[in-house]
A protein has these predicted regions:
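Long, low-complexity, charge-biased intrinsically disordered regions
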Residues: 1-160
């Protein structure tokens, strides 16, 4: 996910800035309302990223509503089975094209490297380019399996 990089405050070879982050805490409840477990995730403050410096492209294709209606109409009229899926923590699976640096998570600063920052290799929640990185990763995977995106909707993949 990341590696520690030393930062010289006087001269920095990094073209991008160091993004700060914060912890987001949540508690999950059981159906009866009792506490199931606590959850925590590190979220970077992507709203501080600067276009052209910290990221380039952010566009990620999203399936068009008309495409969903058309596919469901075909499936119903031809009695095809319909399946769906969800990728847990999808945005964390995207590979980054740009160099992105963030501070070490509060409470998890490496005592041997306190002046280092994290060079991210994968996207994190909050990054401007996280949706695009995920889309590129899943599209490449589907292409490897033999699926192709259609001309009418880049988010509709068909198996040839």
């Amino acid at each position: 996910m990341w590696c520690a990089i030393s930062v010289n405050p006087i001269y920095s070879p990094f073209s991008s800035s160091v993004i700060t982050g914060k912890w987001v805490f949540k508690h999950k409840l059981r159906p009866d309302g009792t506490l199931d477990r606590y959850k925590a995730r590190w979220v970077v403050r992507g709203f501080r990223q600067r276009a052209g410096i910290d990221f380039t492209d952010t566009f990620a294709s999203v399936v068009k509503p008309g495409t969903i209606r058309t596919v469901l109409h075909l499936a119903v009229s031809r009695a095809w089975p319909v399946h769906q899926m969800d990728v847990s923590t999808a945005f964390l699976h995207g590979h980054l094209e740009e160099q992105v640096f963030c501070q070490q998570p509060t409470g998890f600063v490496d005592p041997a490297l306190p002046d280092h920052v994290c060079l991210l290799s994968r996207s994190l929640y909050g990054l401007k380019q996280a949706p695009r990185a995920w889309y590129q990763r899943i599209a490449a995977f589907l292409h490897q399996l033999g699926f192709r995106s259609t001309r009418s909707d880049a988010s509709l993949f068909v198996y040839l």
